[in-house]
């Protein structure tokens, strides 16, 4: 998965985004300062604010600045587990796997039952080749009655079960994500389209892909590549050409387009 794709999950744009703190910093006005000045009131609040800033910078494609903000957060409050969890995601995107593991472990030590920490660590495991191990952490996240976005953990569980070759488990998780989602579950729909494609159920795959594409602007290279292969399987050369044209125009350097040029359709 690309760094952009990971950040998209965090931002809630695609598929099963990883869950981090909402970007809603809390400030109090300093009565001794001007009306324009805002200062955080305590170490925990400072840690929260800088963690949220780190999340924002990461989503905006500035991992270096994000790490600076998270360092400030942890300097303010070394026990603020959310900062470790978010820093783990940033380091995962930078392929600093050992450091990411350390951050997630620290977050889990501080908050072993926190749903967001479990979800994020599960994604780390999935992205580092431990797909089967990741499922337990997604399911642990789902145990919390206070978890506000269980559809994300179900989507991640489905995505990782699919990567592990467990098509039945993946399908069940993704269908649960659809039931619980309040934002259309575009990622879950795309993953279901992939599962049905692998199973040879091309009509069902087409339905889920069409639903996912309606929610994407622009469509991802991944979705266009699946659409191209679906049309090819069904002998629709015009449809295949349309997807190929979009893939070439939008993502000429993508791995998907390179596979197309090589004729590797599976």
Residue ranges and their predicted role:
Residues 24-71, 75-77, 260-266:
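N-terminal leader/linker segments that initiate helical-solenoid repeat arrays
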Residues 59, 93-94, 127-128, 163-164, ...:
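Register position in tetratricopeptide repeats
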Residues 40, 47, 81-82, 115-116, ...:
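Helix-start (N-cap) detector for alpha-helical repeat units in TPR-like alpha-solenoids
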Residues 42, 76, 110, 144-146, ...:
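Structural marker of alpha-solenoid helical repeat scaffolds
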Residues 52, 86-89, 120, 156, ...:
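Canonical tetratricopeptide repeat
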Residues 27-43, 214-266:
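Terminal, low-structured helical/coil segments at or just beyond the last alpha-helical repeat
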């Amino acid at each position: 998965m690309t760094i952009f794709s990971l950040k998209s999950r965090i931002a809630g744009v695609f598929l099963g985004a990883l869950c981090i703190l909402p970007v809603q910093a809390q400030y109090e006005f300093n009565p001794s300062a001007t009306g324009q000045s805002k200062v955080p009131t305590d170490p925990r609040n400072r840690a929260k604010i800088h963690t949220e800033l780190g999340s924002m910078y990461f989503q905006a494609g500035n991992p270096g600045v994000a790490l600076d903000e998270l360092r400030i957060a942890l300097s303010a409050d070394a026990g603020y587990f959310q900062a470790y969890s978010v820093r783990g995601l940033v380091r995962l995107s930078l392929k600093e796997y050992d450091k990411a593991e350390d951050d997630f472990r620290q977050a889990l030590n501080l908050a072993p039952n926190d749903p967001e920490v479990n979800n994020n660590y599960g994604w780390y495991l999935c992205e580092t080749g431990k797909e089967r191990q990741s499922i337990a952490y997604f399911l642990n996240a789902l145990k919390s009655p206070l978890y506000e976005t269980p559809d994300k953990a179900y989507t991640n569980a489905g995505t990782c079960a699919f990567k592990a070759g467990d098509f039945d488990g993946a399908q069940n998780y993704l269908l649960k994500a659809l039931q619980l989602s309040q934002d259309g579950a575009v990622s879950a729909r795309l993953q279901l389209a992939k599962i049905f494609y692998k199973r040879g159920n091309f009509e069902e795959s087409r339905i889920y892909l069409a639903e996912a594409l309606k929610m994407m602007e622009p469509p991802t290279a991944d979705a266009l590549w699946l659409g191209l292969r679906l049309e090819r399987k069904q002998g629709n050369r015009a449809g295949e050409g349309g997807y190929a044209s979009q893939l070439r125009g939008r993502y000429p350097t993508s791995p998907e387009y390179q596979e197309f040029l090589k004729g590797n359709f599976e």
